[in-house]
Amino acid sequence: MTINLPEKEAKRVQIAVDRNPVETSFQKWAKPGHFSRTLAKGPNTTTWIWNLHADAHDFDSHTSDLQDISRKVFSAHFGQLGIILIWLSGMYFHGARFSNYEAWLSDPTHIKPSAQIVWPIVGQEILNGDVGGGFQGVQITSGFFQLWRASGITSELQLYTTAVVGLVLAGAMFFAGWFHYHKAAPKLEWFQNVESMLNHHLGGLLGLGSLGWAGHQIHVSLPVNKLLDAGVDPKEIPLPHEFFLNKQLMIDLYPSFAKGLTPFFTLQWSEYSDFLTFKGGLNEVTGGLNLSDTAHHHLAIAVLFLIAGHMYRTNWGIGHSIKEILDAHKGPLTGEGHKGLYEILTTSWHAQLAINLALFGSLSIVVAHHMYSMPPYPYLATDYATQLSLFTHHCWIGGFCIVGAGAHAAIFMVRDYDPTNNYNNLLDRVLRHRDAIISHLNWVSIFLGFHSFGLYIHNDTMSALGRPQDMFSDTAIQLQPVFAQWVQNTHFMAPQLTAPNALAATSATWGGDVVAVGGKVAMMPISLGTADFMVHHIHAFTIHVTVLILLKGVLFARSSRLIPDKANLGFRFPCDGPGRGGTCQVSAWDHVFLGLFWMYNSLSIVIFHFSWKMQSDVFGTVVNNTVSHITAGNFAQSANTINGWLRDFLWSQSSQVIQSYGSALSAYGLIFLGAHFILLTGMLDIFSGRGYWQELIESILWSHAKLKVAPTIQPRALSITQGRAVGVAHYLLGGIATTWSFFLARIIAVG
């Protein structure tokens, strides 16, 4: 006889909802500040509009009821999905209505992608450059054309249809957001049922999602792309449904289709090796990954996640319990281990969001590095402007997510952390030796900063004194990145031992031959030298400083030596009251503020490194088996001095954007100029003290009051925190737009 212990029994999953919990009221919705008793009274001073923006989405400040907060977040997620679908639909609609997609599809090596035609109002039609094939438009660098070809889209009608479906789905999302807040709102226990959530997200979203995509790739993408690669006119290619209905079409392309589903159900999947391949390397025709490899990959992912979707204990007494796993997770040196973390993650959405943002942001930066080294879509590798744009985009998205992780971890510490429930567990132990963690990070940052910058200073000095033989370079004193070179070589050699059936290594960057498409380099081995070694340590320095700032903000969010009661002051506060020196700009929010600057610094150096390295050592043309790179390999010679970066990268490569006036690239010249002004606005907000503005406003206000023309809503200078927020927003917007215009004008002109 077996007795089930109460904690071993699975909590039965029931979809518990409250019916009609909140009435739909447009009157309430239309009233600014309806979520706050203070704000709903309306404005007395101009501070009101700032507080309105600051608190509109801060659901914690509207109510302390976790169930209501959870419902608001859940509902907002549907709204977010709706907005994303509208945006995506717009992209597909532009492809259908304003693009040269069909022309590009017929000749992707000579025709550039364009999906925007500027209307002639006062001469803007100059922006419609000649992209080839007799089409005038703005060249786009989003990678959508390459994605569409990989999906098997062969006509603009298919893009139209997808755009319409996107709008229908967006409508469904907006409806769901309203329905699940106003009509059938889930109860708190539904949000806290992590096992059921994991099963559905892993098995449903990732498992079935990957399976569906693998199915689409096998039945639509593969046959369409095989015919396109063979040079068949897109208009002659059968429509997607014909490959379903007419089995012979598939058998002609992939003979194993003749065997039907027998090998599938008997698990003889190797019989399908003509379309589920393991080739490695890149497709010689398109320069992208072999789509039969990616179909195989998505099928494998689907199998793994469908299994993972059955791993967690719900209505049946089998599977993992997350609470049991966490509570049992102890090491010999970690006290109570993970005890108490389950309670944190089921009652603090900030804590959960922090972890998810950190992981998602890191993943985005990993994606950035794979998009060029293993370009997943046809003809992506030879579209240099798109390559540069995608790398930059995924780095910045990742950076913002990682800083967001620091922000929400700090908000969790201030608002949700309960010291009484966390005694001697991992979190408590980290907090108790935070001084050691921060001082070590501080030391590492100083060490990396002085030593890596010192190498550059040495080189600049030797260069200025005319002593090239005493510089750190590949031709004088070498600092070769031997570990990185070993990793490259290992990855190049490994497949011959570990995957003998693979035709090539995972990426052409490891070693081997140049992959060229249409006379352009798609990818080739990337050699690393002294200049890479030096800039790598600058990356290490800036990333460690970013981590130092964010982690210090989190670990000292509740208290510090100077302000032991910091938790009572909240997430953001300008100073700790009058009469206490040194307590200004030390809130957790201020650490996020500083973290944003360092994130931007870190990633600027990353994308500059990438842009110059690729132009110097990868991007270029191939004539008679000879590769000519855009900047002829000057990275190794110049990137080892500060002067080299300023002269041969920033100054030399900005000539295209500065001289773009009067050409199709002139918009980038204007953006470059305008974004510098936004950058300066950011600086002004950050550097100027609040007192100066308040004095100025007070004197103007006094004269208005004297003349009895004073406004009813009194002007106020921005608070210190608001000034910093406006400053960092302008700094980032200005910096990103400056870099964007600089990169694109350059690479579109020379690439």
Curated annotation (Swiss-Prot):
GO terms for cellular component: chloroplast thylakoid membrane; photosystem I. Chlorophyll a binds at residues 683, 692. It holds the Pfam family PsaA_PsaB. Phylloquinone binds at residue 693. Disulfide bonds: none annotated. Its EC number is 1.97.1.12. Chlorophyll a' binds at residue 676. One of its GO terms (molecular function) is oxidoreductase activity. It is found in: Plastid, Chloroplast thylakoid membrane. The PsaA/B heterodimer binds the P700 chlorophyll special pair and subsequent electron acceptors. PSI consists of a core antenna complex that captures photons, and an electron transfer chain that converts photonic excitation into a charge separation. The eukaryotic PSI reaction center is composed of at least 11 subunits. HAMAP family: PSI_PsaA. This is Photosystem I P700 chlorophyll a apoprotein A1. The gene is psaA.
